[in-house]
Curated annotation (Swiss-Prot):
EC number: 2.5.1.141
Record's catalysed reaction(s): heme b + (2E,6E)-farnesyl diphosphate + H2O = Fe(II)-heme o + diphosphate
Protein name: Protoheme IX farnesyltransferase 2
An example molecular function term from Gene Ontology annotations: protoheme IX farnesyltransferase activity
Additional notes on this entry: Carbon 2 of the heme B porphyrin ring is defined according to the Fischer nomenclature.
């Protein structure tokens, strides 16, 4: 059912689309938003002090809305390239279900709402970090890096890695080494995750003119870089335990998950240049999603149990 009737709204000829609530929800990139919210929640819970439960809910909702705003602004600007990629052609803007000006307005309103709510009701450091994240993703990455350099997702990955730092700052009003380590885990995870996708979607990116690594440096070079990042990510994933932030439970879980990541990356490294099935790349892409969720779930469980034991012994 349409939210509004199609109608002329001004002399410039802008039209209100017959979009559904589901179309606007899709603008938020809910799958991406769910990972952002989860990692931010882990940062919030792992912080060494407690936060009022109501403020915690406000912080997480603000981060979620901010992440969704970034997605909406990304879809507004990328409508031209989304339209020629099979993976993204059905998105609300390129498919015509939502007008570009609606996506832009929606994204801008949510951006301001999320940042102001977080700043006024929680603290301004976390709000500033959220504002920076929205700007970095929607402007620096989407409008510049994505179409300019094969290092787009390496540099742009910083936006997706900041949420646990925002969660931490929402509780403590500061940034610590522990929150930066959580940032590094996501930052180093991002290139192999997206390059695995780019390997088996290189045709899409080629048609859209996006300089992803496989299209610029070739598949062989991309496979080597994926493996190199996996070798760095694995020990960084264990770093929170080595630095004394977690118990051995997390350390063992992170070690096993990291070894799994390296093994899948090794399989990608050994792919033949003429491999059209791309099964190792698809397997790594799927495993990388599991890895990020599992390693942060282990961190969350470790933090909750450790805090419960500390309270019990008090």
């Amino acid at each position: 059912m349409a939210l509004v009737d199609e109608t002329s709204i001004d002399e410039a000829g802008f039209r209100m689309s017959e979009a559904t609530a589901g179309d606007f929800f899709a603008l938020l990139k809910p799958r991406v938003m769910s990972l952002v919210v989860f990692t931010a929640f882990v940062g919030l819970v792992a912080a060494p002090v407690t936060i009022n439960p109501l403020l915690a809910v406000i912080a997480i909702l603000s981060i979620a809305i901010g992440a969704g705003a970034s997605g909406a602004l990304n879809m507004w600007y990328d409508a031209d390239i989304d339209a020629v990629m099979t993976r993204t052609a059905s998105r609300p803007v390129p498919s015509g279900r939502i007008q570009p000006h609606e996506a832009l307005s929606f994204g801008l309103v949510l951006s301001v709402l999320s940042v102001m709510t977080l700043g006024v009701l929680v603290n301004w450091l976390s709000a500033t970090l959220l504002a920076f994240t929205i700007f970095f993703y929607a402007v620096v990455y989407t409008m510049w890096l994505k179409r300019w350099t094969p290092q787009n997702i390496v540099i742009g990955g910083a936006a997706g890695a900041i949420p646990p730092v925002i969660g931490w700052a929402a509780v403590t009003g500061s940034v610590s080494l522990e929150s930066i380590v959580l940032f590094l885990i996501i930052f180093l995870w991002t290139p192999p995750h997206f390059w695995a996708l780019a390997l088996f979607k290189s045709g899409d990116y080629e048609r859209a003119g996006i300089p992803m690594m496989p299209n610029v440096a070739g598949h062989a070079s991309t496979r080597r870089q994926i493996f190199a990042y996996a070798l760095v990510l694995a020990p960084v994933g264990v770093a929170p335990w080595l630095l004394g932030y977690t118990t051995p439970f997390y350390g063992v879980a992170a070690m096993l998950l990291g070894l799994g990541f390296v093994w899948y990356a090794w399989k990608v490294l050994g792919m033949a240049d003429d491999d059209r099935a791309m099964k190792p790349a698809k397997a790594l892409f799927a495993y990388s999603l599991l890895y990020l969720f599992a390693i942060f779930a282990a961190y969350l469980a470790d933090s909750v149990v450790e805090r419960a034991l500390a309270m019990g012994g008090a």
